[in-house]
Regions:
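N-terminal domain-onset segments
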Residues: 1-55
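Conserved, single-site charged/polar hotspot
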Residues: 37, 43-51, 61, 79, ...
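A generic structural signal for short beta-strands and their flanking turns/coil linkers
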Residues: 41, 72-74, 96-98, 114-116, ...
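Extended, aromatic/histidine-rich regions of cofactor-dependent oxidoreductases associated
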Residues: 136-172
């Protein structure tokens, strides 16, 4: 089993069996697994980030109102379907995980309308690994009781990223 297949299997198990999953009891009873795109090696990138030295703290709106504070950490640029795309990577605290909330051409059609998230990994030689096969829906995609950061306008791209989680049926 590939790393991605194992990751998805573990996530499906968590969603279907764990009472801490974002699914309601009723949703868990009907759960047969999340919907995913097939694995795409073309949507895995090792990128050199442009680090932002001014440590700008920003407020990102939440799906339930209000906002959450985070920091713009770096800018990444990559080629996708013949288009140069630029996205901002965020970090809540120094040394904390890197977070990429984004909205793309699939949002609202093939994937959750508000957008998806990607946890960006550090790679060798000051590069970042962005593997969109691991892109995931925020918990509020499954249950309105969750509050989720909304991808900011700077992370909304027109290109379609057909990798990671797809839209989830509304079983509320």
């Amino acid at each position: 089993m590939s790393d991605l297949a194992n990751f998805r299997s573990q996530k499906d198990k968590y969603f279907g069996e764990d009472h801490n999953s974002p699914l309601t009891d009723r949703q868990r009873e009907m759960f047969n697994g999340l919907n995913y795109y097939g694995e795409s090696t073309e949507l895995t990138f090792k990128l050199t980030p442009t680090l932002l030295t001014d440590d700008i703290e920003v407020e990102i709106p939440l799906s339930t109102g209000g906002s959450t504070s985070t920091h713009r950490w770096a800018i990444v640029s990559f080629e996708l379907n013949g288009t140069r795309e630029i996205l901002t990577v965020f970090r809540e605290e120094e040394g904390g995980p890197l977070f990429l909330p984004f909205r793309d051409g699939t949002s609202g059609k093939e994937t959750y309308g508000m957008g998806r998230y990607l946890e960006v990994q550090s790679a060798e030689e000051n590069k970042l690994l962005m593997d969109f096969n691991y892109a995931y829906n925020p918990f509020c995609a499954y249950n309105d009781n969750w509050s989720c950061p909304i991808p900011p306008p700077e992370n909304r791209i027109s290109s379609s990223i057909r990798a990671g989680e797809c839209i989830y049926p509304d079983w509320n």
